Design a protein with these regions (language model features):
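Hydrophobic residues in beta-strands of the RecA-like P-loop NTPase core, especially within AAA+ ATPase
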Residues: 106, 157, 309-316
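Short hydrophobic alpha-helical runs that function as membrane-insertion/retention elements
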Residues: 134-139, 153-156, 222-225, 245, ...
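Walker A/P-loop
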Residues: 223-265, 330
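Basic, amphipathic alpha-helical bundle interface domains used for macromolecular binding and assembly
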Residues: 37-45, 60, 67-77, 295, ...
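Walker B catalytic acidic pair
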Residues: 305, 311-313, 323
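Conserved alpha-helical scaffold flanking the Walker A/P-loop in AAA+ ATPase domains
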Residues: 213, 269-275, 285-308, 341
Protein backbone atom coordinates (compact mmCIF):
# COMPACT_ATOMS: atom_id res chain seq x y z
CA UNK A 1 0.00 0.00 0.00
CA UNK A 2 1.20 3.50 -0.84
CA UNK A 3 0.81 6.46 1.54
CA UNK A 4 1.77 10.13 1.26
CA UNK A 5 2.39 12.97 3.70
CA UNK A 6 3.35 16.57 2.94
CA UNK A 7 6.36 18.29 4.47
CA UNK A 8 9.05 20.79 3.43
CA UNK A 9 12.82 21.19 3.33
CA UNK A 10 14.84 24.33 4.08
CA UNK A 11 16.90 25.80 1.25
CA UNK A 12 18.42 29.15 2.07
CA UNK A 13 15.65 31.44 3.31
CA UNK A 14 12.90 29.39 1.70
CA UNK A 15 11.08 26.18 2.56
CA UNK A 16 10.42 24.04 -0.51
CA UNK A 17 7.56 21.48 -0.54
CA UNK A 18 8.49 17.82 -0.15
CA UNK A 19 6.16 14.83 -0.47
CA UNK A 20 7.02 11.86 1.74
CA UNK A 21 5.94 8.64 0.00
CA UNK A 22 5.91 5.31 1.83
CA UNK A 23 5.35 1.98 0.08
CA UNK A 24 5.10 -1.47 1.68
CA UNK A 25 6.31 -4.28 -0.57
CA UNK A 26 6.90 -8.02 -0.07
CA UNK A 27 10.42 -8.86 1.02
CA UNK A 28 12.73 -8.98 4.00
CA UNK A 29 11.83 -6.46 6.74
CA UNK A 30 13.77 -3.24 6.34
CA UNK A 31 13.41 0.47 5.66
CA UNK A 32 15.12 2.07 2.67
CA UNK A 33 15.30 5.84 2.17
CA UNK A 34 15.66 7.39 -1.30
CA UNK A 35 15.43 10.95 -2.61
CA UNK A 36 18.85 12.40 -1.67
CA UNK A 37 18.52 12.28 2.14
CA UNK A 38 21.40 13.43 4.31
CA UNK A 39 22.91 11.51 7.24
CA UNK A 40 20.34 12.84 9.73
CA UNK A 41 17.48 11.57 7.56
CA UNK A 42 19.21 8.23 7.00
CA UNK A 43 19.39 7.80 10.77
CA UNK A 44 15.64 8.44 11.02
CA UNK A 45 15.11 4.77 10.13
CA UNK A 46 16.13 3.74 13.63
CA UNK A 47 14.34 6.65 15.31
CA UNK A 48 11.06 5.92 13.51
CA UNK A 49 11.20 2.19 14.27
CA UNK A 50 11.88 2.75 17.97
CA UNK A 51 9.30 5.55 18.26
CA UNK A 52 6.56 3.42 16.68
CA UNK A 53 7.36 0.43 18.89
CA UNK A 54 7.56 2.44 22.11
CA UNK A 55 4.32 4.27 21.25
CA UNK A 56 2.39 0.99 21.01
CA UNK A 57 2.14 0.72 17.21
CA UNK A 58 2.96 -2.28 15.05
CA UNK A 59 6.22 -2.16 13.19
CA UNK A 60 6.05 -3.26 9.54
CA UNK A 61 7.25 -6.82 8.91
CA UNK A 62 7.74 -6.20 5.20
CA UNK A 63 10.07 -4.15 3.04
CA UNK A 64 9.47 -0.40 3.41
CA UNK A 65 10.57 2.12 0.79
CA UNK A 66 10.47 5.82 1.71
CA UNK A 67 10.86 8.37 -1.09
CA UNK A 68 11.36 12.09 -0.53
CA UNK A 69 10.06 13.78 -3.67
CA UNK A 70 11.29 15.59 -5.69
CA UNK A 71 14.23 13.21 -5.85
CA UNK A 72 16.67 15.66 -7.51
CA UNK A 73 16.85 18.02 -4.52
CA UNK A 74 18.92 17.22 -1.45
CA UNK A 75 17.11 17.18 1.91
CA UNK A 76 18.57 17.48 5.37
CA UNK A 77 17.57 17.55 9.01
CA UNK A 78 15.45 15.42 11.34
CA UNK A 79 12.19 17.26 10.57
CA UNK A 80 11.13 14.39 8.28
CA UNK A 81 10.85 11.92 11.19
CA UNK A 82 7.23 12.81 11.91
CA UNK A 83 5.89 12.72 8.31
CA UNK A 84 7.70 9.41 7.70
CA UNK A 85 6.13 7.89 10.84
CA UNK A 86 2.62 9.14 9.99
CA UNK A 87 2.84 7.94 6.39
CA UNK A 88 4.08 4.57 7.65
CA UNK A 89 1.06 4.27 9.95
CA UNK A 90 -1.25 5.00 7.02
CA UNK A 91 0.51 2.51 4.76
CA UNK A 92 0.26 -0.22 7.44
CA UNK A 93 -3.47 0.41 7.98
CA UNK A 94 -3.15 1.87 11.50
CA UNK A 95 -4.33 5.35 10.46
CA UNK A 96 -7.03 6.49 8.06
CA UNK A 97 -5.45 8.02 4.90
CA UNK A 98 -8.02 10.82 4.92
CA UNK A 99 -6.65 12.07 8.25
CA UNK A 100 -3.45 13.25 6.52
CA UNK A 101 -5.11 14.94 3.55
CA UNK A 102 -4.18 18.62 3.38
CA UNK A 103 -1.84 18.45 6.38
CA UNK A 104 1.78 19.61 6.40
CA UNK A 105 3.94 17.88 9.02
CA UNK A 106 7.40 18.51 10.47
CA UNK A 107 9.11 17.34 13.64
CA UNK A 108 11.83 15.16 15.12
CA UNK A 109 11.07 11.91 16.94
CA UNK A 110 12.70 10.64 20.11
CA UNK A 111 13.19 6.93 20.67
CA UNK A 112 10.40 7.00 23.26
CA UNK A 113 7.96 8.53 20.77
CA UNK A 114 8.30 12.10 22.03
CA UNK A 115 8.12 14.96 19.54
CA UNK A 116 11.15 17.23 19.63
CA UNK A 117 11.50 20.73 18.15
CA UNK A 118 13.45 21.39 14.97
CA UNK A 119 14.75 24.51 13.25
CA UNK A 120 13.13 26.35 10.35
CA UNK A 121 9.54 25.82 11.52
CA UNK A 122 8.56 29.42 10.76
CA UNK A 123 9.77 29.13 7.15
CA UNK A 124 7.93 25.80 6.75
CA UNK A 125 4.78 27.37 8.21
CA UNK A 126 4.96 30.17 5.62
CA UNK A 127 5.30 27.55 2.89
CA UNK A 128 2.36 25.56 4.29
CA UNK A 129 0.19 28.67 4.22
CA UNK A 130 1.26 29.38 0.63
CA UNK A 131 0.29 25.81 -0.32
CA UNK A 132 -3.09 26.37 1.40
CA UNK A 133 -2.61 23.52 3.84
CA UNK A 134 -5.57 22.71 6.09
CA UNK A 135 -3.32 22.59 9.16
CA UNK A 136 0.32 22.44 10.18
CA UNK A 137 1.37 19.56 12.46
CA UNK A 138 4.35 20.33 14.72
CA UNK A 139 5.79 19.36 18.12
CA UNK A 140 4.34 21.30 21.06
CA UNK A 141 7.67 23.08 21.54
CA UNK A 142 7.34 24.60 18.04
CA UNK A 143 3.63 25.51 18.28
CA UNK A 144 4.19 29.11 19.39
CA UNK A 145 6.72 29.69 16.60
CA UNK A 146 4.41 28.18 13.97
CA UNK A 147 1.52 30.35 15.19
CA UNK A 148 3.46 33.49 14.21
CA UNK A 149 2.05 32.89 10.71
CA UNK A 150 -1.53 34.07 10.99
CA UNK A 151 -4.37 32.23 9.31
CA UNK A 152 -2.77 28.77 9.54
CA UNK A 153 -4.35 26.26 11.98
CA UNK A 154 -1.76 24.54 14.18
CA UNK A 155 -1.96 20.95 15.46
CA UNK A 156 0.62 20.06 18.09
CA UNK A 157 1.34 17.28 20.56
CA UNK A 158 4.09 16.18 22.90
CA UNK A 159 4.22 12.54 21.76
CA UNK A 160 3.48 10.55 18.64
CA UNK A 161 0.73 8.64 20.47
CA UNK A 162 -1.06 11.84 21.48
CA UNK A 163 -0.87 13.17 17.94
CA UNK A 164 -2.33 10.00 16.41
CA UNK A 165 -5.19 10.09 18.91
CA UNK A 166 -5.93 13.69 17.90
CA UNK A 167 -5.97 12.75 14.24
CA UNK A 168 -8.13 9.67 14.80
CA UNK A 169 -10.79 11.42 16.85
CA UNK A 170 -10.79 14.65 14.89
CA UNK A 171 -9.85 16.89 17.83
CA UNK A 172 -9.99 20.57 16.94
CA UNK A 173 -6.84 22.42 16.07
CA UNK A 174 -4.84 23.91 18.90
CA UNK A 175 -5.86 27.42 19.84
CA UNK A 176 -2.39 28.95 19.78
CA UNK A 177 -3.04 32.70 20.06
CA UNK A 178 -1.58 34.74 17.25
CA UNK A 179 0.83 37.21 18.89
CA UNK A 180 0.10 40.88 18.79
CA UNK A 181 2.36 43.02 16.65
CA UNK A 182 3.30 45.19 19.63
CA UNK A 183 4.34 42.31 21.89
CA UNK A 184 8.12 42.24 22.36
CA UNK A 185 10.18 39.15 21.76
CA UNK A 186 10.64 36.99 24.84
CA UNK A 187 14.10 35.81 23.89
CA UNK A 188 17.08 37.02 21.97
CA UNK A 189 19.70 35.15 20.05
CA UNK A 190 22.11 33.49 22.49
CA UNK A 191 25.15 34.75 20.61
CA UNK A 192 23.90 38.32 20.39
CA UNK A 193 25.69 40.74 22.65
CA UNK A 194 23.07 42.90 24.30
CA UNK A 195 23.76 46.59 24.71
CA UNK A 196 24.25 47.84 28.25
CA UNK A 197 21.49 49.89 29.79
CA UNK A 198 23.74 52.77 30.79
CA UNK A 199 23.88 55.81 28.56
CA UNK A 200 27.16 56.98 30.07
CA UNK A 201 29.37 56.71 26.98
CA UNK A 202 27.09 59.12 25.13
CA UNK A 203 28.13 61.93 27.47
CA UNK A 204 31.65 62.01 26.00
CA UNK A 205 33.28 61.78 22.55
CA UNK A 206 31.12 64.44 20.87
CA UNK A 207 32.53 63.87 17.37
CA UNK A 208 31.93 60.12 17.54
CA UNK A 209 28.44 60.71 18.93
CA UNK A 210 27.51 62.71 15.84
CA UNK A 211 28.96 59.97 13.64
CA UNK A 212 26.82 57.47 15.54
CA UNK A 213 23.68 59.51 14.89
CA UNK A 214 24.50 59.78 11.17
CA UNK A 215 25.11 56.03 10.95
CA UNK A 216 21.81 55.28 12.69
CA UNK A 217 19.76 57.71 10.62
CA UNK A 218 21.12 56.93 7.16
CA UNK A 219 22.29 53.33 7.57
CA UNK A 220 25.92 54.29 6.94
CA UNK A 221 28.87 52.08 7.85
CA UNK A 222 31.18 53.48 10.53
CA UNK A 223 34.88 53.05 11.35
CA UNK A 224 36.17 54.26 14.72
CA UNK A 225 39.93 54.52 15.31
CA UNK A 226 41.36 55.33 18.70
CA UNK A 227 43.61 54.23 21.55
CA UNK A 228 42.53 51.54 24.03
CA UNK A 229 39.85 52.58 26.49
CA UNK A 230 38.56 55.64 24.65
CA UNK A 231 35.00 54.27 24.36
CA UNK A 232 34.86 52.67 20.89
CA UNK A 233 33.17 49.45 21.98
CA UNK A 234 30.76 51.13 24.38
CA UNK A 235 29.69 53.61 21.73
CA UNK A 236 29.07 50.80 19.24
CA UNK A 237 26.88 48.96 21.73
CA UNK A 238 24.68 52.04 22.07
CA UNK A 239 23.81 52.12 18.37
CA UNK A 240 20.90 49.61 18.47
CA UNK A 241 19.28 51.75 21.18
CA UNK A 242 18.91 54.80 18.95
CA UNK A 243 17.75 52.86 15.89
CA UNK A 244 13.99 53.00 15.13
CA UNK A 245 11.87 49.93 15.97
CA UNK A 246 11.63 47.12 13.45
CA UNK A 247 8.70 47.20 11.06
CA UNK A 248 6.39 44.17 10.83
CA UNK A 249 8.04 42.90 7.65
CA UNK A 250 11.54 43.39 9.10
CA UNK A 251 10.56 41.60 12.32
CA UNK A 252 9.10 38.64 10.41
CA UNK A 253 12.19 38.37 8.21
CA UNK A 254 14.55 38.54 11.19
CA UNK A 255 12.53 35.96 13.13
CA UNK A 256 12.57 33.69 10.09
CA UNK A 257 16.35 34.05 9.79
CA UNK A 258 16.88 33.11 13.41
CA UNK A 259 14.52 30.16 13.04
CA UNK A 260 16.48 28.82 10.07
CA UNK A 261 19.76 29.32 11.93
CA UNK A 262 18.38 27.50 14.97
CA UNK A 263 18.98 30.45 17.33
CA UNK A 264 15.38 31.52 17.88
CA UNK A 265 14.56 29.62 21.06
CA UNK A 266 11.06 29.58 22.55
CA UNK A 267 9.22 32.68 21.41
CA UNK A 268 5.63 33.86 21.63
CA UNK A 269 6.01 36.84 19.31
CA UNK A 270 8.11 38.22 16.50
CA UNK A 271 11.62 39.36 17.36
CA UNK A 272 11.34 43.10 17.89
CA UNK A 273 14.80 43.92 19.21
CA UNK A 274 17.31 44.97 16.60
CA UNK A 275 20.21 42.50 16.60
CA UNK A 276 23.70 43.39 17.73
CA UNK A 277 26.24 40.80 16.58
CA UNK A 278 29.86 41.04 17.67
CA UNK A 279 31.81 38.08 16.23
CA UNK A 280 35.34 37.44 17.46
CA UNK A 281 38.19 38.15 15.05
CA UNK A 282 38.98 34.41 14.97
CA UNK A 283 35.61 33.71 13.32
CA UNK A 284 35.92 31.77 10.07
CA UNK A 285 34.52 32.89 6.74
CA UNK A 286 31.69 30.35 7.06
CA UNK A 287 30.87 31.63 10.54
CA UNK A 288 30.82 35.27 9.44
CA UNK A 289 29.20 34.93 6.03
CA UNK A 290 27.42 31.60 6.35
CA UNK A 291 28.05 28.38 4.49
CA UNK A 292 27.65 24.63 4.35
CA UNK A 293 26.49 22.15 1.74
CA UNK A 294 22.98 23.37 2.43
CA UNK A 295 23.89 26.96 3.39
CA UNK A 296 22.94 28.45 6.73
CA UNK A 297 23.09 32.14 7.64
CA UNK A 298 26.21 33.50 9.32
CA UNK A 299 26.80 36.44 11.63
CA UNK A 300 26.38 38.90 8.76
CA UNK A 301 22.83 37.74 7.98
CA UNK A 302 21.90 37.28 11.64
CA UNK A 303 22.66 41.00 12.07
CA UNK A 304 20.11 41.85 9.35
CA UNK A 305 18.23 44.99 10.29
CA UNK A 306 20.67 45.73 13.10
CA UNK A 307 24.36 46.22 13.84
CA UNK A 308 27.36 44.07 12.92
CA UNK A 309 30.24 45.13 15.15
CA UNK A 310 33.76 44.11 14.16
CA UNK A 311 36.02 44.96 17.09
CA UNK A 312 39.79 44.80 16.55
CA UNK A 313 39.16 45.13 12.83
CA UNK A 314 42.79 44.72 11.76
CA UNK A 315 42.93 41.32 13.50
CA UNK A 316 40.38 39.88 11.07
CA UNK A 317 41.96 38.11 8.08
CA UNK A 318 42.05 40.42 5.09
CA UNK A 319 40.52 37.75 2.84
CA UNK A 320 37.44 37.53 5.07
CA UNK A 321 36.97 41.31 5.22
CA UNK A 322 37.20 41.55 1.45
CA UNK A 323 34.42 38.98 1.14
CA UNK A 324 32.16 41.44 2.96
CA UNK A 325 32.49 44.07 0.24
CA UNK A 326 29.76 42.91 -2.14
CA UNK A 327 27.18 41.93 0.53
CA UNK A 328 27.61 45.28 2.28
CA UNK A 329 27.03 47.05 -1.03
CA UNK A 330 23.97 45.06 -2.11
CA UNK A 331 22.40 44.10 1.22
CA UNK A 332 22.06 40.51 -0.01
CA UNK A 333 24.48 37.60 0.27
CA UNK A 334 24.28 35.10 -2.59
CA UNK A 335 25.59 31.57 -2.10
CA UNK A 336 26.06 29.16 -4.98
CA UNK A 337 26.53 25.43 -4.62
CA UNK A 338 26.60 22.59 -7.10
CA UNK A 339 22.87 21.91 -6.74
CA UNK A 340 21.43 25.19 -5.49
CA UNK A 341 21.73 28.96 -5.32
CA UNK A 342 20.18 30.89 -2.47
CA UNK A 343 20.22 34.38 -0.98
CA UNK A 344 20.33 35.61 2.61
CA UNK A 345 19.38 39.23 3.44
CA UNK A 346 22.14 41.21 5.16
CA UNK A 347 21.09 44.85 5.25
CA UNK A 348 23.22 45.80 8.25
CA UNK A 349 24.93 48.83 9.72
CA UNK A 350 28.58 47.84 9.98
CA UNK A 351 30.49 49.37 12.87
CA UNK A 352 34.22 48.64 12.97
CA UNK A 353 36.72 49.61 15.65
CA UNK A 354 40.49 49.39 15.72
CA UNK A 355 43.57 50.87 17.35
CA UNK A 356 45.73 53.29 15.31
CA UNK A 357 48.82 51.06 15.54
CA UNK A 358 50.00 47.70 16.97
CA UNK A 359 50.75 49.16 20.42
CA UNK A 360 47.58 51.26 20.30
CA UNK A 361 49.01 54.58 21.49
CA UNK A 362 49.86 56.43 18.28
CA UNK A 363 48.59 60.00 18.55
CA UNK A 364 47.95 59.78 22.30
CA UNK A 365 49.67 62.70 24.05
CA UNK A 366 49.78 60.80 27.36
CA UNK A 367 51.42 57.62 26.10
CA UNK A 368 54.41 57.24 23.82
CA UNK A 369 53.92 55.08 20.72
CA UNK A 370 56.49 52.28 20.47
CA UNK A 371 55.79 51.42 16.82
CA UNK A 372 57.91 52.41 13.86
CA UNK A 373 56.41 53.93 10.74
CA UNK A 374 56.97 50.63 8.91
CA UNK A 375 55.10 48.71 11.61
CA UNK A 376 52.17 51.10 11.40
CA UNK A 377 52.13 50.82 7.62
CA UNK A 378 52.09 47.02 7.79
CA UNK A 379 49.37 47.19 10.42
CA UNK A 380 47.07 49.22 8.17
CA UNK A 381 47.94 47.22 5.07
CA UNK A 382 45.79 44.46 6.56
CA UNK A 383 42.82 46.52 5.36
CA UNK A 384 42.37 46.82 1.62
CA UNK A 385 41.57 50.11 -0.06
CA UNK A 386 38.27 48.85 -1.54
CA UNK A 387 37.11 47.75 1.92
CA UNK A 388 37.94 51.13 3.51
CA UNK A 389 36.23 52.77 0.56
CA UNK A 390 32.92 51.23 1.65
CA UNK A 391 33.01 52.73 5.15
CA UNK A 392 31.02 55.94 4.80
CA UNK A 393 32.03 57.38 8.17
CA UNK A 394 35.63 57.27 9.37
CA UNK A 395 36.43 59.09 12.58
CA UNK A 396 39.28 59.32 15.05
CA UNK A 397 38.52 59.09 18.77
CA UNK A 398 40.80 60.93 21.14
CA UNK A 399 41.58 59.83 24.70
CA UNK A 400 39.05 61.07 27.24
CA UNK A 401 40.57 63.93 29.29
CA UNK A 402 40.78 63.31 33.00
CA UNK A 403 38.52 66.26 33.70
CA UNK A 404 35.69 64.70 31.67
CA UNK A 405 35.80 61.24 33.24
CA UNK A 406 33.27 62.26 35.88
CA UNK A 407 30.73 62.83 33.11
CA UNK A 408 30.71 59.09 32.49
CA UNK A 409 28.91 58.66 35.82
CA UNK A 410 26.09 61.03 35.01
CA UNK A 411 22.59 59.62 35.09
CA UNK A 412 20.46 59.36 31.98
CA UNK A 413 18.40 62.36 33.08
CA UNK A 414 21.53 64.48 33.54
CA UNK A 415 22.77 63.69 30.03
CA UNK A 416 19.45 64.11 28.20
CA UNK A 417 20.11 67.72 27.25
CA UNK A 418 23.54 67.00 25.74
CA UNK A 419 22.19 64.02 23.83
CA UNK A 420 19.44 66.14 22.30
CA UNK A 421 21.89 68.83 21.24
CA UNK A 422 24.08 66.30 19.44
CA UNK A 423 21.06 64.61 17.79
CA UNK A 424 22.04 61.32 19.44
CA UNK A 425 18.51 60.35 20.40
CA UNK A 426 15.98 57.87 19.02
CA UNK A 427 13.55 60.71 18.35
CA UNK A 428 16.02 62.66 16.17
CA UNK A 429 16.99 59.53 14.26
CA UNK A 430 13.35 58.55 13.76
CA UNK A 431 12.49 62.04 12.51
CA UNK A 432 15.36 61.92 10.00
CA UNK A 433 14.29 58.49 8.76
CA UNK A 434 10.71 59.66 8.38
CA UNK A 435 11.93 62.43 6.07
CA UNK A 436 13.89 59.88 4.03
CA UNK A 437 10.87 57.59 3.64
CA UNK A 438 8.73 60.49 2.46
CA UNK A 439 11.33 61.78 -0.02
CA UNK A 440 13.22 58.73 -1.31
CA UNK A 441 11.68 56.15 -3.67
CA UNK A 442 10.40 52.98 -1.97
CA UNK A 443 11.29 54.47 1.40
CA UNK A 444 15.01 53.81 0.97
CA UNK A 445 17.62 55.03 3.40
CA UNK A 446 20.12 57.57 2.10
CA UNK A 447 22.89 54.97 2.12
CA UNK A 448 20.92 52.90 -0.42
CA UNK A 449 20.36 55.64 -3.00
CA UNK A 450 21.97 55.32 -6.41
CA UNK A 451 23.68 58.25 -8.10
CA UNK A 452 20.63 58.87 -10.29
CA UNK A 453 18.23 58.73 -7.34
CA UNK A 454 20.47 60.99 -5.26
CA UNK A 455 20.56 63.57 -8.02
CA UNK A 456 16.79 63.38 -8.51
CA UNK A 457 15.59 63.25 -4.89
CA UNK A 458 18.60 64.50 -2.90
CA UNK A 459 17.68 68.21 -3.17
CA UNK A 460 21.34 69.27 -3.38
CA UNK A 461 22.00 72.97 -3.90
CA UNK A 462 24.20 74.09 -6.79
CA UNK A 463 26.82 75.64 -4.50
CA UNK A 464 26.95 72.38 -2.54
CA UNK A 465 27.58 70.51 -5.78
CA UNK A 466 30.42 72.89 -6.64
CA UNK A 467 31.96 72.41 -3.19
CA UNK A 468 31.63 68.65 -3.58
CA UNK A 469 33.34 68.70 -7.00
CA UNK A 470 36.26 70.68 -5.58
CA UNK A 471 36.71 68.18 -2.74
CA UNK A 472 36.55 65.20 -5.11
CA UNK A 473 39.13 66.79 -7.40
CA UNK A 474 41.47 67.85 -4.60
CA UNK A 475 41.37 64.56 -2.70
CA UNK A 476 41.16 62.43 -5.85
CA UNK A 477 38.28 60.44 -4.43
CA UNK A 478 36.96 57.41 -6.24
CA UNK A 479 33.49 57.42 -7.73
CA UNK A 480 32.25 55.29 -4.85
CA UNK A 481 33.78 57.54 -2.18
CA UNK A 482 32.44 60.70 -3.80
CA UNK A 483 28.93 59.24 -3.99
CA UNK A 484 29.09 58.16 -0.35
CA UNK A 485 30.18 61.67 0.59
CA UNK A 486 26.97 63.05 -0.91
CA UNK A 487 24.87 60.42 0.85
CA UNK A 488 26.37 61.34 4.22
CA UNK A 489 25.77 65.04 3.52
CA UNK A 490 22.13 64.27 2.72
CA UNK A 491 21.76 62.43 6.05
CA UNK A 492 23.37 65.32 7.95
CA UNK A 493 20.83 67.68 6.38
CA UNK A 494 18.00 65.36 7.44
CA UNK A 495 19.29 65.31 11.02
CA UNK A 496 19.43 69.11 10.94
CA UNK A 497 15.82 69.14 9.64
CA UNK A 498 16.92 71.08 6.54
CA UNK A 499 15.22 70.29 3.19
CA UNK A 500 18.23 71.07 0.97
CA UNK A 501 21.86 69.99 1.18
CA UNK A 502 24.10 73.04 1.53
CA UNK A 503 27.82 73.73 1.58
CA UNK A 504 27.95 73.33 5.35
CA UNK A 505 26.64 69.78 5.06
CA UNK A 506 29.29 68.89 2.48
CA UNK A 507 31.97 70.39 4.72
CA UNK A 508 30.75 68.40 7.72
CA UNK A 509 30.62 65.19 5.68
CA UNK A 510 34.27 65.70 4.68
CA UNK A 511 35.23 65.65 8.37
CA UNK A 512 34.03 62.04 8.52
CA UNK A 513 36.29 60.87 5.66
CA UNK A 514 39.59 60.71 7.54
CA UNK A 515 41.15 57.62 5.98
CA UNK A 516 40.18 57.59 2.32
CA UNK A 517 42.05 54.90 0.39
CA UNK A 518 45.12 54.92 2.69
CA UNK A 519 45.67 55.45 6.40
CA UNK A 520 48.40 58.02 5.84
CA UNK A 521 46.43 60.54 7.86
CA UNK A 522 47.30 58.71 11.06
CA UNK A 523 50.78 57.46 10.16
Amino acid sequence: MLARCSSASIQGMEALPVTVEVDLAPGLPGLQLVGLPDAAIQESRERVRAALRNSGFRGPLVRVIVNLAPADRRKEGPAFDLPIALALLVASGQLDPQKLEGLCCAGELGLDGSLRPCRGILAIACQAKTQQAKAFVVPSANAAEASLVGGLPIVSAQTLGQLVEQLRHGIEHNSCPHPTREEPATTTSPSSASAPSSAAPLTIQHFARKALAIAAAGGHHLLMVGPPGCGKTMLARQLPKILPPLSDSEALELTRLQSIAGTLGNVTSLVRQRPFRAPHHSTTAAGLLGGGTNPRPGELSLAHGGVLFLDELTEFPRSILDQLRQPLEEGVLWMSRARLRCAFPCRVTLVAATNPCPCGWHGDPSNRCRCSELQRQRYWNRLSGPFLDRLDLQCRLEPVPTGQLRRCFKTTADSTENQTEDSVSPEAVQAARTKMCQRNPSGQLNSQLSALELGRYGQIEERAFQCWEQVVSKRQLSMRSSLRLLRVARTIADLDAVPNVGEQHIAEAICFRSYDQTPKAII
